[in-house]
Amino acid sequence: MLSATCRRLAPALRRLRALSAVAGRFLQVPGARLCSDQSERAEQPHTFHPALLQFLVCPLSKKPLRYEASTNELVNEELGIAYPIIDGIPNMIPQAARTTRQNEKQEEAEQP
């Protein structure tokens, strides 16, 4: 049964590979280049574009975020959290956010 599945899957994968090669030749974005080796890819920095801030909001509070270039994070001042930006892509999963108000919490705990 497994070999029959493999026999049916192999031609489909070959067709898919052929189609993707053809599509790669004809569906090219003007001005875009394909990187053939890793060193060329490593030279291109992945930076966050602040223009994206008009579309992004905090997933928890739905409030606008502020871009902090020094830490490369998107900050929600209201909640005191910061979302990391990795390779130019904001990681806006709430569990990935770090708190920015640790000092304030410590001060409140120390005061009687």
Swiss-Prot record:
Major localisation: mitochondrion
Q: Which InterPro entries match?
A: Trm112-like (IPR005651)
Q: Which domain of life is it from?
A: Eukaryota
Keyword Mitochondrion tagged: yes
GO BP terms:
GPI anchor biosynthetic process; protein stabilization
Q: Could you tell me the keywords of this UniProt record? A: Mitochondrion, Transit peptide
Transit peptide located at 1-34
Q: A Gene Ontology CC term for this entry?
A: plasma membrane
Q: Which residues cross the membrane?
A: none
Instruction: List the HAMAP family hit by this protein, alphabetically.
Output: UPF0434
Oligomeric form and interacting partners: Interacts (via TRM112 domain) with NDUFAF5; the interaction is direct and stabilizes NDUFAF5 protein. Interacts with COQ5; the interaction is direct, stabilizes COQ5 protein and associates PYURF with COQ enzyme complex.
Q: Give the family this protein belongs to, as stated in its UniProt record.
A: Belongs to the PREY family.
Record-given protein name: Protein preY, mitochondrial
What taxonomic classification does the UniProt entry list for its organism? Answer: Eukaryota, Metazoa, Chordata, Craniata, Vertebrata
* Encoding gene (name): Pyurf
